[in-house]
C-alpha cells in the first residue's frame, strides 16, 4: 500500500476536503505521481539510447516529454501535500506501482522508441482518465489538474504517432 493510504502518522497539513474525498483524491494524485515519474525515466532512457535516421527529432521530442512529466509529477506531488497526503516518489514505489510496461535496455531504433513512447503515453493517459472520473465528484480541483496533464500527455502521444506516419 502506498503512503497515500497511510493515515496512522500524524498529518501536519489539514485539508478542507472531507476524509473520504481526501482519500480518493490522494489515491489519484499518488497514482499519477508514480506514472509520471516512471514516464520521465522511460523517456530519458529512450533519449539516451535512440538511434536511427530520425535520431535528432525523436531525441528532442523525448526531452519535451521528460520536461512535461517531471513538471507534472511535481504538480501532483504538491497537490497531494496540499490536501494532507504525503506523496511517495521513491524508486521502489515507482517500480512497484507504475502502469508503464518495462522499457528495453541498450540502443533502440527510432521506430521502436516511437512505438514504445506511444504505448507508454497511452498507458498513462488511460490511467489518468480513470483518475479524472474518480475525482469528478469528491474533488473537482484535483480533477481539473489531472485533466490538464492528461491533455498534454495525449498531445505528445499524437505527436509520436505522427512521427510514425503511414507505414
Model feature map: region roles:
Residues 1-15:
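Acidic, low-complexity proline/glycine-rich segments
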Residues 51-93:
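Conserved alpha-helical segments that form or flank metal/cofactor-binding pockets of metalloenzymes
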